[in-house]
């Protein structure tokens, strides 16, 4: 039988007749579910089979939250320098250049102002794909300036966190951003301007220790990893087994660290419902 044997050897297909399968047609979730890429995008990058929320960046969040994907980006051209002349396995300047070329981003956060369900909203959204979403001087400065913009124009402010923490290549300059951003958020609170913190997967390190937990409401998406040190580090340090679902958004909500968890498809409606209520406005459908 020739079912599993080629009867004629040396058969070759001309290159022009080969059909290439485009990349990105399918997505496989951690549970093994296969999803069509177009279906995934139309479902807010959530796997319809198991509800898994795929990691997305500022482009996708702006598209979800701003009406008709229209917004004005703030401080668009700001980039990091290398004040410490830092070098580990490669020079910091080379690492930044490689990240910029790979992602098309200037740094790990983008800030913008636009309409969300008809009302103005300022959003600072982190991008994990840029050096792990690490917080350096530019990230802190852009968030601080976005908060200043919200304060000056009396607009609600929202930060979408997705970060591995402080950027080690900037050392103490990076750690200073925790204090800088916290002070700006305190100014918003004094002016009674709403601040919403959305912690997404993953939100860790100095980000968690600063602006990610300082919202008037702190919210998250299902299954997000949120903590200071990662679960492996905590377990290795304490030598103890960790509770079930430790450092997940569900665990933190149960312990009172989060106000609520929302599916991405409901995010825009829920944050605007909150803004309507806290600003004593008619609730929009």
Swiss-Prot record:
The keyword Lipid metabolism applies. Pathway: Lipid metabolism; malonyl-CoA biosynthesis; malonyl-CoA from acetyl-CoA: step 1/1. PANTHER family: ACETYL-COENZYME A CARBOXYLASE CARBOXYL TRANSFERASE SUBUNIT BETA, CHLOROPLASTIC. Its EC number is 2.1.3.15. InterPro entries: AcCoA_carboxyl_beta, Acetyl_CoA_COase_Trfase_b_su, ClpP/crotonase-like_dom_sf, COA_CT_N. The keyword tRNA-binding does not apply. This is Acetyl-coenzyme A carboxylase carboxyl transferase subunit beta. One of its GO terms (biological process) is fatty acid biosynthetic process. It comes from Christiangramia forsetii (strain DSM 17595 / CGMCC 1.15422 / KT0803) (Gramella forsetii). One of its GO terms (cellular component) is acetyl-CoA carboxylase complex. One of its GO terms (molecular function) is carboxyl- or carbamoyltransferase activity. Component of the acetyl coenzyme A carboxylase (ACC) complex. Biotin carboxylase (BC) catalyzes the carboxylation of biotin on its carrier protein (BCCP) and then the CO(2) group is transferred by the transcarboxylase to acetyl-CoA to form malonyl-CoA. Residues 24-285 form the CoA carboxyltransferase N-terminal domain. Acetyl-CoA carboxylase is a heterohexamer composed of biotin carboxyl carrier protein (AccB), biotin carboxylase (AccC) and two subunits each of ACCase subunit alpha (AccA) and ACCase subunit beta (AccD). It holds the Pfam family Carboxyl_trans. Keywords: ATP-binding, Cytoplasm, Fatty acid biosynthesis, Fatty acid metabolism, Lipid biosynthesis, Lipid metabolism, Nucleotide-binding, Transferase. It is found in: Cytoplasm. It catalyses: N(6)-carboxybiotinyl-L-lysyl-[protein] + acetyl-CoA = N(6)-biotinyl-L-lysyl-[protein] + malonyl-CoA. HAMAP family: AcetylCoA_CT_beta. It is an enzyme of class 2 (transferase). Belongs to the AccD/PCCB family.
């Amino acid at each position: 039988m020739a079912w599993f044997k080629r009867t004629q050897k040396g058969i070759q297909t001309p290159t022009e007749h080969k059909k290439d399968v485009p990349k990105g047609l399918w997505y496989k979730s951690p549970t093994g579910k296969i999803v069509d890429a177009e279906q995934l995008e139309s479902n807010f990058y959530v796997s319809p089979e198991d509800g898994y929320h795929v990691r997305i960046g500022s482009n996708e969040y702006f598209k979800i939250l701003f009406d008709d994907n229209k917004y004005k980006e703030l401080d668009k051209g700001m980039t990091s320098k290398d004040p410490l002349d830092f070098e580990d396995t490669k020079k910091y300047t080379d690492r930044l250049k490689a990240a910029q070329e790979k992602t098309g981003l200037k740094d790990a956060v983008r800030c913008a102002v636009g309409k969300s369900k008809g009302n103005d909203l300022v959003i600072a959204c982190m991008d994990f794909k840029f050096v792990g979403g690490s917080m350096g001087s530019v990230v802190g400065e852009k968030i601080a300036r976005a908060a200043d913009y919200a304060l000056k124009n009396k607009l609600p402010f929202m930060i979408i966190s997705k970060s591995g923490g402080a950027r080690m290549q900037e050392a103490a300059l990076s750690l200073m951003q925790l204090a800088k951003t916290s002070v700006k958020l305190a100014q918003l609170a004094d002016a009674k301007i709403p601040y919403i913190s959305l912690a997404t997967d993953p939100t860790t390190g100095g980000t968690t220790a600063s602006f990610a937990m300082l919202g008037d409401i702190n919210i998250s998406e299902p299954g997000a990893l949120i903590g200071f040190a990662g679960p492996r580090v905590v377990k290795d340090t304490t030598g103890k087994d960790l509770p079930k679902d430790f450092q997940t958004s569900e665990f933190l909500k149960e312990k009172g660290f989060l106000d609520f968890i929302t599916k991405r498809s409901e995010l825009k409606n829920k944050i605007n419902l909150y803004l309507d209520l806290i600003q004593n406005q008619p609730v929009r459908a």
